[in-house]
């Protein structure tokens, strides 16, 4: 749901319902995590998928013309960098005749947090090669997951 005063009001929860589990799929090349549009905003969900062995996180999504320019690239780069995985956002093209205007800009961010593919708002397609060895390389160079201190991430009330 979104309510940015003077820009956009849209209540997805009136038509969509939330899921109740983390989705990991085994493929011929490895595990992938699958979320949907709004899920990209929750770092904990991406972390759970990465910790379950997902090497690529897929998020089909349709950010709008307010949140898209502000957050689309930033969130995909962040989730990729945080978890040292590939993060793929697949978006519909902008249709100015539709009642909802999607930002478009399908994107792939690599484990270093760099954008390796980003389309514009037009209907388009691009084929990109994803090198899963890059994940191992980045995790060796910057061992974030290895050095994570999960033991400290608990709140003890006193």
Stretch-by-stretch model annotation:
Residues 70, 74, 133-136, 151:
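Generic alpha-helical secondary structure signal
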Residues 121-123, 130-131, 137-138:
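Structured C-terminal cap/extension of enzyme domains
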Residues 8, 37, 99-102, 152:
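Intrinsically disordered, low-complexity N-terminal regions enriched in serine/proline/glycine
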Residues 41-126:
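CN hydrolase (nitrilase-like) catalytic-core segments centered on the catalytic cysteine
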Residues 28-29, 111-113, 131-133:
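Short loop segments at secondary-structure junctions
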Residues 24-26, 108, 127-129:
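Short, well-ordered beta-strand micro-motif
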Residues 1-52, 65-74, 141-144:
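Active-site catalytic loop in hydrolytic enzyme cores
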Residues 136-158:
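A short C-terminal boundary segment appended to hydrolase-like catalytic domains
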